[in-house]
């Protein structure tokens, strides 16, 4: 317990304060939000910050298209709105992105899977392939998001309630984080009333 825990720091000091210095490796970190509560937006913001800080970021999306995730992360990196990003001409965009690339060594890889079709076995294969074929080793992995992944060891059926199924996915993601010695960030959906629960 005297060993210093290795962490991936946030760019925002507030998050470093509440996490004691950033995301610990080998952990599953879950953002809790109601439907349309900004789960993907927050994860894209964090992903952009980690990339800008020189970290290799793997963003796995089971909901939005790769292109939409890339747009959100680019807007965060360039510190512009989505509207401004879409109206930016190609030469201005290229100039800004080349400047960013010269300032940071962090890389970003985005992978899209069909909703409810991908599980940790797919993610494990992806990480291994990226390491072997592209020499890309992630420092942090984002999974967007927990409730719409699949379990690698449990089939969803009428006899299994959704809580048990999502719990199994969370356990598998935590094992994935431990296996690859990285923090995994995901999100889960709650009802608007559930976010006010005294259990949280």
Language-model segments: which ranges?
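The Walker A (P-loop) glycine that initiates the GxxxxGKT/S ATP-binding motif of P-loop NTPases
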Residues: 32-33
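Hydrophobic positions on the alpha1 helix immediately C-terminal to the Walker A/P-loop
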Residues: 42, 46, 69
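Substrate-engagement module of ASCE P-loop NTPases
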Residues: 51-52, 163-190
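Conserved glycine(s) of the Walker
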Residues: 38
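Pre-Walker A (Motif I) flank of P-loop NTPase domains
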Residues: 24-29, 55
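Cytosolic-facing regulatory segments adjacent to core modules
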Residues: 19, 52-137, 199
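Core recognition of P-loop NTPase motor domains used across DNA-transaction enzymes
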Residues: 1-25, 100-108
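Phosphate-binding/switch loop-helix module in NTP-utilizing enzymes
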Residues: 109-176
């Amino acid at each position: 317990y005297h060993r210093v825990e290795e962490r991936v720091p946030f760019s925002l000091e507030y998050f470093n304060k509440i996490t004691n210095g950033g995301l610990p490796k080998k952990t599953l970190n879950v953002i809790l939000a109601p439907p349309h509560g900004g789960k993907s937006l927050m994860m894209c913001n964090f992903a952009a910050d980690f990339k800008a800080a020189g970290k290799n970021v793997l963003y796995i999306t089971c909901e939005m298209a790769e292109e939409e995730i890339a747009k959100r992360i680019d807007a965060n990196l360039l510190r512009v709105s989505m509207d401004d990003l879409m109206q930016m001409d190609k030469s201005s965009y290229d100039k800004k992105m080349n400047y960013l690339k010269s300032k940071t060594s962090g890389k970003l890889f985005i992978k899209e899977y069909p909703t409810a079709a991908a599980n940790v076995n797919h993610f494990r294969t992806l990480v291994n392939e990226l390491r072997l074929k592209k020499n890309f080793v992630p420092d942090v992995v984002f999974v967007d998001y927990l409730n719409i992944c699949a379990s690698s060891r449990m089939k969803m059926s009428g006899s299994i309630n959704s809580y048990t199924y999502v719990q199994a996915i969370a356990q598998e993601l935590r094992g994935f984080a431990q296996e690859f010695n990285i923090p995994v960030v995901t999100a889960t959906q709650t009802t608007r009333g559930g976010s006010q629960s005294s259990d949280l």
